[in-house]
Amino acid sequence: MKNNFSKYQGLGNDFIIFDARSNNLDHLFSKNKDNFIEHLCNRNFGIGADGIILILESNNKCFVRMKIYNSDGSEPEMCGNGIRCLIAFLNDNNEINELSEIPIETKAGLILTYIDGNENIKVNMGEPILSPLDIPTKLLMNSLKVPNGVITLKDQILNVYAASMGNPHMIVFVNDIEGIPFQEWGSFLEKHNTFPNDTNVHFVEIIDKSNIKVKVWERGCGPTLACGTGACACLVVTSKLGKTLNNANVYLPGGKLEVEWPNQSGPVFMQGPALKVFSGEIDI
């Protein structure tokens, strides 16, 4: 059966979007027969993407519900770049109109979004989670109220931190982000037993109090050009440790996100673009 799709990207973090509000796509994707999610996301034999977004009717009086799948078929709780892509899709299809606040239902809870054109989509990402039990992580809370510990990787002792934005994140500070063995460290740390549900991994280089560089190893995807929830988690940890202000530009391989955590309390706000790449139809 032929189904329409659109491909969107937020800072190069790309997604195949299906409107699943009036068909059986949700059931088909849940079954993932013959690993067809992986096939669709394959950049050589499929459409190619970091993940898939299904737009569904909300169960909680939100505008829509977002379900997301990683390229390996796993289902994460939330995705910051993905939710901006969903908003851009709805905007391009004239569904948003003059709404000033667009509530989206996700596996991580209700997320409030705002749009001023597809180049400028702001997301209230909710309050960060720093309780080790709720992240979850086996790292212990340090004196600054951030989960922290060390992990040994061959001859390296890595000082790591943790936070959650509805999904788990490990933060590792490095002096030269381009000089690390990224593939080796990322794949090892994603599956480390200090994170029972695996984790997204972010290598962070501090530029100054208002600017940081981040390189992303995404859980279930591997290297990606950006991670919205990860950018927020990084800002939460850097601001708690006094390495940045409560707002900073986060420079990822795919571009810049603006992240703010006012007064180090309440929700984190993320702002950035999401743009259409192309549309088509495919047999599923």
Swiss-Prot record:
Gene Ontology cellular component annotations, sorted alphabetically: cytosol
Point out the annotated site residues (description: Could be important to modulate the pK values of the two catalytic cysteine residues): 169, 218
The main place the protein resides is: cytoplasm
Keywords from the named record? Amino-acid biosynthesis, Cytoplasm, Isomerase, Lysine biosynthesis
Q: Could you name the domain of life of the organism this protein comes from?
A: Bacteria
**Its biological purpose:** Catalyzes the stereoinversion of LL-2,6-diaminopimelate (L,L-DAP) to meso-diaminopimelate (meso-DAP), a precursor of L-lysine and an essential component of the bacterial peptidoglycan.
Q: State the EC number(s).
A: 5.1.1.7
Q: Where found? A: Cytoplasm
Q: Which InterPro entries match?
A: DAP_epimerase_AS, DAP_epimerase_DapF
- Annotated substrate binding lies at 13, 70, 80-81, 167, 200, 218-219, 228-229
User: Which gene underlies this protein?
Assistant: dapF
Gene Ontology terms describing biological process: lysine biosynthetic process via diaminopimelate
Q: What is this protein called?
A: Diaminopimelate epimerase
Where's the active site on this chain?
79 (proton donor), 227 (proton acceptor)
PROSITE patterns annotated for this entry? DAP_EPIMERASE
Annotated GO molecular function terms are: diaminopimelate epimerase activity
State the similarity comment: Belongs to the diaminopimelate epimerase family.
* Quaternary state and interactors: Homodimer.
SUPFAM superfamilies according to UniProt: Diaminopimelate epimerase-like (SSF54506)
What pathway is this protein said to act in by its record? Answer: Amino-acid biosynthesis; L-lysine biosynthesis via DAP pathway; DL-2,6-diaminopimelate from LL-2,6-diaminopimelate: step 1/1
What is the catalytic activity of this protein? (2S,6S)-2,6-diaminopimelate = meso-2,6-diaminopimelate
